[in-house]
Curated annotation (Swiss-Prot):
Summary of the function given for this chain in its UniProt record: With CysD forms the ATP sulfurylase (ATPS) that catalyzes the adenylation of sulfate producing adenosine 5'-phosphosulfate (APS) and diphosphate, the first enzymatic step in sulfur assimilation pathway. APS synthesis involves the formation of a high-energy phosphoric-sulfuric acid anhydride bond driven by GTP hydrolysis by CysN coupled to ATP hydrolysis by CysD.
Residues the record lists as binding GTP: 34-41, 113-117, 168-171
Region: G1, residue numbers: 34-41
Limits of the tr-type G domain: 25-239
Organism of this sequence: Salmonella arizonae (strain ATCC BAA-731 / CDC346-86 / RSK2980)
G5: region residues: 206-208
Pathways per UniProt: Sulfur metabolism; hydrogen sulfide biosynthesis; sulfite from sulfate: step 1/3
Name of this chain's protein: Sulfate adenylyltransferase subunit 1
GO molecular function: ATP binding; GTP binding; GTPase activity; sulfate adenylyltransferase (ATP) activity
Source species taxonomy: Bacteria, Pseudomonadati, Pseudomonadota, Gammaproteobacteria, Enterobacterales
Length: 479
């Protein structure tokens, strides 16, 4: 057993008491990102090593791996704790998003180590989508690079408000204060163009030597701020979903017997109480909450992030993908939206293409109307393009096959975030963040292939009880 873990269990008075204490610790999800070889994996390895989260067999294996794959000579190559794929170890880079877990006496942590190479930007965006804080590593010898700007922009685009700029490899510049000050000034100048109200902090460190990671550095006495670990343990994460109106996307309908009908899901934002009046979108039907059922029994109130089952006082038609919200909310379903897109497929995104989209349990179809612009995230400028390439980021207007209840992503990532799915391969090809619903006039009918129209006609003729919608709509009447 890990020595520090054994000490913590003994201090709490046994395994059960220790597990209860762990449940009540706050959780911080953060990612490390930056340019290639800035030391992201080494930093995570240093955090795990200095907080004594490594077991004896792992340490022994690390010694052996450092001799075979290491890049630090006779020293331990702490990056190998994270770079688990064989290709990563052979090339000395990170390719996939690697997740690691550790805890201190003050907090629990989930780390996402993301790749630095530009061709793996989609992997980095995936890692950032669930994080509260981003550590942006900068090589003290190189300063702010294009990839640093790229990752900073993607992090803020995905709603991360807390940025820790870790200026790494200070040992290679003789721990000079002027180097730290120059890079800090350069980054702040760039950050003025980043969207949102950001909390930006700077820490000079050496992941390889351990300076200012978990303990204060004797080599940088000019720096009086907190260590990186102290920042992570004390940063106040204000979740935006706690302050937003109630949203409850229905994951599925639970009907184990004739006497029970509950709607299961995770409360995306806000809170809900027994007796509260609710409205169902897109139907607009209203009811009230009679029970809030959880794994631990019935509750009088539930909060954002909790998995619950809602029982209503009325028997109304609710299915997977519907959205429950407060009855007095004025949210109207939208059929058009402007969406920030991170494109993840080799085949570029072009106007006129149709995809399946999935948003908070709701799956429907959408068409690309126009690409307003692509963002050059090296200098945050906008340029007109005819298509959005792999790893491209741009603002796109989409038309949905049916009206959807949408929130702005920066206010509610669950009901404002969606994925694009290729209808033939079923592969996720893009991620979208709703910028704003778009007002349009009469909705034009979606264009369908001859095969889809024929299949729709066959289904309606031979399976009328399925209640399939006529894809041609009013065109029959017009004809």
């Amino acid at each position: 057993m890990n020595t520090i873990l054994a000490q913590q269990i003994a201090k709490e008075g046994g395994v059960e008491a220790w597990m209860i204490a762990q449940q009540h610790k706050s959780l911080l999800r953060f990612l490390t990102c930056g340019s290639v070889d800035d030391g992201k994996s080494t930093l995570i390895g240093r955090l795990l090593h200095d907080t004594r989260q490594i077991y004896e067999d792992q340490l022994s294996s690390l010694h052996n791996d450092s001799k075979r794959h290491g890049t630090q000579g006779e020293k331990l190559d702490l990056a190998l704790l994270v770079d688990g794929l064989q290709a990563e170890r052979e090339q000395g880079i990170t390719i996939d998003v690697a997740y690691r877990y550790f805890s201190t006496e003050k907090r629990k942590f989930i780390i996402a180590d993301t790749p630095g190479h530009e061709q793996y930007t989609r992997n980095m965006a995936t890692g950032a989508s669930t994080c509260d804080l981003a550590i942006l590593l900068i090589d003290a010898r190189k300063g702010v690079l294009d990839q640093t700007r790229r990752h900073s922009f993607i992090s803020t685009l995905l709603g991360i408000k807390h940025l820790v700029v870790a200026i790494n490899k200070m040992d290679l510049v003789d721990y000079r204060e002027e180097t730290f000050a120059r890079i800090r000034e350069d980054y702040l100048t760039f950050a003025e163009r980043l969207p949102g109200d950001l909390d930006i902090r700077f820490v000079p460190l050496s992941a390889l030597e351990g300076d200012n990671v978990a303990a204060q550095s004797a080599n940088m006495r000019w720096y009086s701020g907190p260590t990186l670990l102290e920042v992570l343990e004390t940063v106040d994460i204000q979740r935006v979903v706690d302050r937003q109106p109630m949203r409850f996307p229905v994951q599925y309908v639970n009907r184990p017997n004739l006497d029970f009908r509950g709607y299961v899901g995770t409360l995306a934002s806000g809170s809900i109480k027994v007796g509260e009046r609710i409205k169902v979108l897109p139907s607009g039907v209203e009811s009230s909450v009679s029970r809030i059922v959880t794994f631990d029994g019935d509750r009088e109130e539930a909060y954002a992030g909790e998995a619950i089952t809602l029982v209503l006082n009325d028997e109304i038609d609710i299915s997977r993908g519907d959205l429950l919200l407060a009855a007095n909310e004025a949210l109207a379903p939208a059929q058009y939206a402007a969406i920030d897109v991170v494109w993840m497929a080799e085949q570029p995104l072009t106007p006129g293409q149709s995809y399946d989209v999935k948003l908070a349990g709701k799956k429907t179809r959408a068409r690309v109307e126009t690409i307003r612009y692509q963002i050059d995230i090296n200098n945050l400028t906008q340029r007109d393009v005819e298509s959005l390439p792999l790893n491209g980021i741009g603002l796109v207007e989409m038309a949905f096959d049916e009206p959807l209840a949408l929130d702005i992503y920066q206010q509610n990532p669950v009901t404002g975030g969606l994925i694009f799915i290729d209808r033939l391969s079923n592969i996720t090809v893009g991620a979208g963040m709703v910028r704003e619903p778009v007002e349009r006039g009469v909705t034009p009918p979606m264009e369908y292939s001859a095969f889809e129209l024929e299949l729709n006609a066959l289904v309606r003729r031979h399976f009328p009880h399925w209640n399939a919608r006529d894809l041609l709509g009013d065109k029959h009447g017009a004809a």
